[in-house]
Amino acid sequence: LRDAENFDAVVAAGGDGTVASVAYLLAETGIPLLPFPAGTANLLAMNLASPAEPHALAHLMREQRLMDFDIGEIELSNGERFGFSMIAGAGYDAAIMEGAEPSKRLLGPMAYFTAAFANFAPQFSRITLTIDGKTVETQGVGVLAINFSKLQFDISLVHENLPRDGMFDIVVMNTHDAVGLIPAILSCMLDRAGEFPSRP
């Protein structure tokens, strides 16, 4: 991407990880990014309603049908930095992503469900969050920083989600095991209006 400024736009063909990496490198350059869904989940392309056909993608660019969205940055303890555009997770979510990696090519999106069922008793941890200068102490099996919230089957992790407001939605999986997540998952599936008491 060193010569990206010489082009009118950049097409990132791949899954969410590939697209997020390219988006992070192009952040604040003003160069349009066109995500072409060629990975396992392609959730960012789905949230953006990005077409899966090259001609249609080129048509979007010609018409300048573009939008800005937020990019998150993660810095590891060793100083390494990388970005995310959809969701960043620690704990159970990260374990699912890692567990799904070997079987994604064979199983596709089902690899994530298989990895989740294989780790039905994730580690329960104390969680310390610093949000806008305020420290929050909580506990659970994981925490998510959400930019775009829509997953497969038109399920949204949070009800009111604005990926262009300069903020992330933070969700703590406040349970001792995966079974405790079932009510929240069902409410996300059944209650699209956000009226269910357990709805994030």
Regions found by a protein language model. Give the residues of each.
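ATP/NTP phosphate-donor binding region
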Residues: L1-V10, A20, Y24, E28, ...
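Conserved Motif II region of HX4D acyltransferases
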Residues: G17-T18, V143
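Short glycine-/acidic-enriched loop or helix-start segments at secondary-structure transitions
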Residues: S21-Y24, L44-M46, D154-I155, I182
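Catalytic core of DAGKc-family lipid kinases
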Residues: A27-A145
